């Protein structure tokens, strides 16, 4: 599972940001773990395109297509962090991070019937994609990870789609106007957490008082 593979890298960054415990970063078991993550990442990479595949979605449900936009954003961020921590590999890791970012915009951005761009949930690199979102790993969090700004039109269109009443798993217009998914077909608490982080904090805080 791609999101779980890179999660320790993001968790390590959170720990270092709070503690400034640089000695921990140099512990042998930490460095061995980071090396193992990089090795596993190489196994998941498409041979010709800088996208990484997964076999399960963030909910642990089966995928529709193997290349998830959200998961690859996590890979992009993890590669940036690893570049900061591994000076000898900095150039190659940053180059790969840039390649992943470019591949996401090339292959994971689609257009709706009006020609407006949005981030697909997943793609297969053969022309197929799906419009979807999951609270455990939401496309709403892309600005939170620094992948784009909240002013990014592609991201704004994406959020508008999945929060719209037209989207199958949206609870727009309901007392808790959040997002569900087949794994949990109701407004998840995780969706409230996403709203707190993605620019809908006022709404989420109001819903938490219901």
Regions found by a protein language model. Name each.
Residues 7-24, 74-88, 140-151, 191-207:
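Well-ordered alpha-helical scaffold segments within catalytic/enzyme domains
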């Amino acid at each position: 599972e791609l999101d779980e593979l890179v999660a320790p890298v993001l968790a390590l960054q959170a720990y270092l940001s709070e503690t400034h415990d640089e000695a921990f970063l140099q512990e042998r078991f930490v460095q061995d773990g980071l090396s193992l993550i990089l090795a596993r990442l190489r196994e998941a990479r498409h041979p010709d395109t800088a996208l990484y595949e997964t076999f399960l979605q963030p909910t642990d449900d089966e995928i529709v297509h193997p290349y998830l936009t959200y998961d690859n954003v996590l890979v992009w961020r993890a590669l940036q962090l690893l570049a900061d921590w591994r000076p000898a590999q900095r150039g190659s890791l940053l180059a790969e991070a840039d390649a992943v970012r470019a591949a996401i915009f090339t292959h994971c951005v689609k257009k709706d019937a009006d020609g407006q761009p949005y981030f697909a949930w997943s793609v297969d690199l053969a022309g197929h994609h799906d419009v979807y979102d999951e609270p455990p790993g939401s496309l709403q969090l892309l600005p939170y990870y620094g992948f784009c700004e909240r002013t990014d039109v592609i991201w704004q269109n994406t959020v508008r789609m999945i929060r719209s009443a037209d989207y199958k798993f949206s609870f727009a217009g309901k007392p808790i106007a959040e997002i569900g998914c087949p794994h949990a077909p109701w407004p998840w608490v995780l969706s409230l957490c996403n709203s707190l982080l993605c620019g809908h904090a006022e709404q989420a805080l109001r819903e938490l008082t219901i």
